[in-house]
Amino acid sequence: MSLFNKIVKEFQWGQQKVRLETGEIARQASGAVIVDIEDTVVLATVVGAKSAKPGQDFFPLTVDYIEKTYSAGKIPGGFFRREGRPSEHETLTSRLIDRPLRPLFPEGFYNEVQVVIHVLSVNPEIPADIPALIGASAALAVSGLPFNGPVGAARVAYVNNEYVLNPTREQIKASRLDLVVAGTERAVLMVESEADQLPEDVMLGAVVFGHEQMQTAIDAIHELVREGGKPEWDWQPAPKDEALNARVTELAQPELLAAYQIRDKQARLTKLKEVYAATSAKLEEEAVAAGTVAADKATVGNILFDLEAKIVRGQILNGEPRIDGRDTRTVRPIEIRTGVLPRTHGSALFTRGETQALVVATLGTKGDEQIIDALEGEYRERFMLHYNMPPFATGETGRVGSPKRREIGHGRLAKRALVACLPSADEFGYSIRVVSEITESNGSSSMASVCGGCLALMDAGVPMKAHVAGIAMGLILEGNKFAVLTDILGDEDHLGDMDFKVAGTADGVTALQMDIKIQGITKEIMQVALAQAKEGRMHILGKMKDAVAGANTQLSEFAPRMITIKINPEKIRDVIGKGGSVIRALTEETGTTIDISDDGVVTIASTNSEGMAEAKKRIENITAEIEVGHVYEGTVLKLLDFGAIVNLLPGKDGLLHISEIVNERVKDINDYLKEGQQVKVKVIQTDEKGRVRLSAKALLNEAAAQADTPPQQ
């Protein structure tokens, strides 16, 4: 009898074969599933606490996606030779998995749940994020935890005007779209994408195509659960205290209505805090008078939050003004200023209502590119975008330091939005870093980073293909009534049913991110939302073009200049020198940065044009070939009885024989030459061994012949 109750499900999915299995590995976890897609193998595990911690008032879900270097047949770098802190890719993939799973846990479920996905084997052509998402969904489904899944996921590419399901990495490179969609049988829950200025209907078509194709994976998970699933947890939400609900509503509703008439964010937050405190104090006072135990503040806070949501959503669906007084389609006032910082290469201050981004662009050389040691192989990133949001941006105190998951995710979204409109490395050889410092935040700060990033790049002189703008949208749905909100505030983000961010140019979408919290949002609703987002994006693009018509034609005086020369690849070692000695001396003495590619292209960069010219001259001398008939200004290195060794170019010497110094017979070479003396010589012969024969006498004879030639009439 086997020790394991191993259940396996296999299915064909597009061009790929998928295998799901449970029951053999990690049996003490609440749920564990191995997913194998064409040799990319992940182990997804789920553990759920049997009870919530006392006083818990939120759902503590953590998702950790971990790539093991052995999966690609590698040993980790570093002193300890083991995996360390999560890479940016691991953080982004953890967020990608978290986003569609979180909305499917029932309201009031506060037990701690941890999802851990290990990448065990990697086929470089099959990205591990889709297997990881399917594995996490399947592990939750077999665990018996209260989870309204399963979730399916698919990657969609757009090649030759056709959608491609779960493309290989080679297909992604040729695609104008890289889109990941996740959802249940009935609804899309999450979209993450990067595109090359595609129209809205193509983007929506990709979402619908991906949702249709993921049903195959969802069906397989259902089959796995039927055969290998654990019993469902007997969990029931805590019964609602209707009397407490009614009393909180009676005490707080008028004050909350008044608070949401305040247009200024900080003043409104102050008023809301007062309402929360006053309501809790009143309830405690009543409990003392009645001799009962007062409701805990977390429960009261949740009731007040639900009441806030009901007020704001009701006002919007009834056609009343939004929190800040706008209608559903209006973008907040925009202010733009470029060239804000005097010594940076490019900068822009982009303000939209109470959201503000100070964005700075810096130009560097090839040596400044980010080297990424990914499982599928090492590669370089010439464009980096980093997003920072310090606590003062929302008027709060908090930790300042390394970027949090949210900051990494927002930075990647803004990068995706801009990358399609950057010039190629051949057109613009610089590496580029953009940093977005969020100085004020009230919703849509990642999209402010897109707008500010585009403007800062143009200010730096980067020849962008087009202006790029981004806008954050919201959606509220109640029954058959819905409202799409343009340029949402932070409060509208928290209280809505869907938030999605669209970035692009006048010609199409470059990035789309959707997070949907409820079932029932149809293709038609998404169509309306995308059309309204385009309207908002075009408005912002108009403001940006009014402020900055195009990229600066001149780089900042503080940005490095670059020149490129081509050398014989066989001469690269001469330029580098033993242990890098030659190139190190070159860079230090000329104040330049020098990059040499394997094909012999040498890039010299510096803010000092004289230093660049000197470095160029020296490299040309090092790599030059000695040619017969050419005249060189050489230096006498050594005197011999039969002649002198003369240095012509760095590392290249020749013999000036005693008979080739002057026309008369030379008895003592010291009468004519000294070590260190500059001497003009002509190359008269080279042989297959690289030996060079020189003559000074030949130049004397040529000069005499020219002197004897009568001038032409």
UniProtKB/Swiss-Prot annotation:
Residues 629-697 form the S1 motif domain. It catalyses: RNA(n+1) + phosphate = RNA(n) + a ribonucleoside 5'-diphosphate. The keyword Nucleotide-binding does not apply. GO terms for molecular function: 3'-5'-RNA exonuclease activity; magnesium ion binding; polyribonucleotide nucleotidyltransferase activity; RNA binding. Mg(2+) binds at D493, D499. Gene3D superfamilies: GHMP Kinase, N-terminal domain, K Homology domain, type 1, Nucleic acid-binding proteins. Keywords: Cytoplasm, Magnesium, Metal-binding, Nucleotidyltransferase, RNA-binding, Transferase. Its EC number is 2.7.7.8. Its cofactor is Mg(2+). It is found in: Cytoplasm. GO terms for biological process: mRNA catabolic process; RNA processing. It is an enzyme of class 2 (transferase). The keyword ATP-binding does not apply. Residues 560-619 form the KH domain. It comes from the Bacteria. GO terms for cellular component: cytosol. Pfam families: KH_1, PNPase, RNase_PH, RNase_PH_C, S1. Involved in mRNA degradation. Catalyzes the phosphorolysis of single-stranded polyribonucleotides processively in the 3'- to 5'-direction. Belongs to the polyribonucleotide nucleotidyltransferase family. HAMAP family: PNPase. This is Polyribonucleotide nucleotidyltransferase. It comes from Burkholderia mallei (strain ATCC 23344). The lineage of its organism: Bacteria, Pseudomonadati, Pseudomonadota, Betaproteobacteria, Burkholderiales. The gene is pnp.
